Amino acid sequence: EPHPIMIAHGLSHLIPFEHEDLQKWESSLHFGLSPQHFNTIHSETNLCFGGGLDDVWQNQETGQLHIVDYKSTAQLGKEPRQLNESFLNDKWKAAYKRQMEMYQWIMRKKGFDVSSKGYFLYVDGQHINKAGMIDKDQPSKAYMEFNTSIIPYDGRDDWVEDALFNIKELLLNENPPEHAEDCEYAKFLRETQSALKN
C-alpha cells in the first residue's frame, strides 16, 4: 500500500516495489558483480555499470517502475527556497539528474518496464526559530525536524550508451585528458602541488 508521504503528495497510485534483490540493489557500499546486484554488463564495451539505488516505487495502474533518489539539505537562508522542480536547477545538481538517468537505464537493461519519471524525495532540515537539536533532559540525544518534499523529474537516458563508449575509449587511451578549467579535482591537485613546492 502507498506510504503516507506518497499519499500526502498526491501519489497514492504508487506503492513501494518489492523484489527479492532489492536489498542488494540498495547496497552501494557493497557493489557486487553478480546479476543480483544493481549493475549491468554493457556487452559492447564489457564495462560493468552500476551503483546503489535508494528506492523503487511501482505504479499500480501501469505496472511501471519509478526510480526514487533520497536527498537531504538544510537551507541556511532566512527565506529558504521551495523544494520543487526549480530546486534541481543548480548547476551542480545536474549530477543528481545524471544519476537518476543512469539508474533508469540500468533498470531497463535488467529487463524492467521503467517510467522516465523518477522522483527525488528531499528532506530539508529546519533550523529557523528552533531552540537546538540537543535534548536538554537527555543530552546524549539530539533531534532535528525536517520538511519533506517529493520532486518529480523526467529523465532521458539516451546519452548513457555513448558515455560508456567514451569511457571505454578514455580507459584505453595512453594519455590522460586535460582537466576542465572548472574541474574541482584539478583545482585540488594544483593547490596540492603548489603546497608541496613551498
Regions from the language model: what does each represent?
Residues 1-61, 192-198:
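Metal-dependent nuclease catalytic cores that hydrolyze phosphodiester bonds in DNA/RNA
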Residues 8, 55, 66, 102-109, ...:
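Residue-level signal for well-ordered alpha-helical scaffold segments within enzymatic catalytic domains
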Residues 42, 46, 86-97, 173-176:
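Short, charged/polar micro-motifs that form catalytic or ligand-binding hotspots
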Residues 48-50, 63-65, 141-148:
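Short, mixed charged/polar active-site loops
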Residues 51-86, 103:
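Conserved catalytic cores of phosphodiester-cleaving nucleases, focusing on short active-site segments
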Residues 76-94, 148-153:
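Short histidine-centered catalytic/ligand-binding loop motif
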Residues 88-118:
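Metal-dependent nuclease catalytic cores in nucleic-acid-processing enzymes
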Residues 106-198:
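Metal-dependent nuclease catalytic regions and adjoining charged, substrate-binding loops involved
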